[in-house]
Swiss-Prot record:
GO terms for molecular function: acetylcholine receptor inhibitor activity; ion channel regulator activity; toxin activity. InterPro entries: Conotoxin_a-typ, Conotoxin_a-typ_CS. The modification Sulfotyrosine is found at Y59. Keywords: Acetylcholine receptor inhibiting toxin, Amidation, Disulfide bond, Ion channel impairing toxin, Neurotoxin, Postsynaptic neurotoxin, Secreted, Signal, Sulfation, Toxin. Transmembrane segments: none annotated. Its main location: secreted. Residues 48-50 are annotated as: Ser-Xaa-Pro motif, crucial for potent interaction with nAChR. This is Alpha-conotoxin PnIB. It is found in: Secreted. Residues 22-44 form a propeptide.
Length: 61
């Protein structure tokens, strides 16, 4: 294989790795957002119950 061909293959591998890394990172961001929403809903449910709200003043204000 010539030097130019090896460099082209190297660039293709770097590009493919970057694309896979970028898309998997965005997928994990969506998962983190869903988990944060679930936690917020759970805390809001707790804050509507007086005993739970009293035992968690940091979250319920």
């Amino acid at each position: 294989m010539g030097m130019r061909m090896m460099f082209t293959v190297f660039l293709l591998v770097v590009l493919a790795t970057t694309v896979v890394s970028f898309t998997s990172d965005r997928a994990s961001d969506d998962g983190n957002a869903a988990a944060s929403d679930l936690i917020a809903l759970t805390i809001k449910g707790c804050c509507s119950l007086p005993p739970c709200a009293l035992s968690n003043p940091d979250y319920c204000g």
